[in-house]
A protein has these predicted regions:
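S-adenosyl-L-methionine-dependent nucleic acid methyltransferase catalytic domains
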Residues: 1-103, 107-111, 118-122, 126, ...
Length: 242
């Protein structure tokens, strides 16, 4: 995967899991709880291969000394660090996101936090622009499940903090897992230039629509068929008043 230009900051969303039998992928109606995530159900060997590819791409386009924030459950504490090291990324510490409202799970204790692996590209002194009293516990209210557009949607505030701590206005930010587009919205709010990738075409559409609604602007398609134009045409055909 080729990602350019080089980035001052990288934000990558980790994987999440839910029972495969509950996944009901649909083309017209997109509900995060019904749509499976790409690469969500893979073997340990395949997951290791994917980690090397993902972290390798982050390191390849990240400037030396610049940071990456990688979300992932605590179970990844044994998986991420060795691959980060192999990719030339220094694993500094974890940041704990306290969601303020617990998440119902099948475990004995409800989940109320998520881990972020804070790392930077080796080869230069790392850049940190946050205050001296910044802590590794971020209390940020989670997105209301009724308004979520992606199964692992993160609050925009999380991306805003990462950008303010590790990048300057006008610099580039890369998100290899675009998902709901929270990173793009955070970049708009903080004056950064965001570059997003998303494997699922439907979530690409979600990101574009969310950006258009937030900015009031119209996204321009660089190449290929316009899914929104085709969708509007289908709606016109279904509307007998047109």
């Amino acid at each position: 995967v080729r990602v350019e230009p080089r980035s001052n900051n990288a934000i990558a969303a980790g994987l999440s899991s839910f029972p495969a039998e509950e996944a009901q992928a649909g083309r017209r109606k997109l509900r995060p709880r019904d749509r499976p995530l790409e690469n969500d159900f893979v073997s340990d060997e395949e997951f290791g291969r994917l980690l090397h590819a993902w972290f390798g791409n982050i390191a390849r386009v990240l400037l030396p000394g610049r940071a990456a924030y990688i979300w992932g459950g605590y179970a990844n504490i044994a998986n991420y660090p060795p691959v980060l090291k192999a990719a030339g990324l220094y694993f500094s510490q974890t940041i704990i996101w306290v969601k303020e409202h617990p998440v119902l799970t099948r475990k004995d204790f409800m989940g109320n936090h998520e881990w972020c692996f804070y790392t930077w590209r080796e080869g230069a002194a790392h850049v940190f622009l946050g205050p001296n009293n910044a802590t590794d516990v971020w209390s940020v209210k989670k997105v209301n499940p009724q308004s979520m557009v992606h199964l692992t949607e993160k609050p925009v505030e999380l991306a805003v903090r990462a950008m303010q701590y590790s990048s300057r206005p006008g610099e580039n930010v890369l998100d290899l897992f675009g998902g709901s587009g929270s990173t793009l919205i955070a970049a708009e709010q903080t004056g950064r230039r965001a570059f997003l990738m998303e494997l699922d075409p439907l979530y690409c559409d979600v990101i574009v629509r969310r950006w258009e609604q937030f900015t009031g602007q119209k996204a321009e398609l660089a190449s290929g068929p316009d899914p929104f134009r085709e969708e509007d045409a289908d709606d016109d055909e279904d509307n007998p008043d047109n």
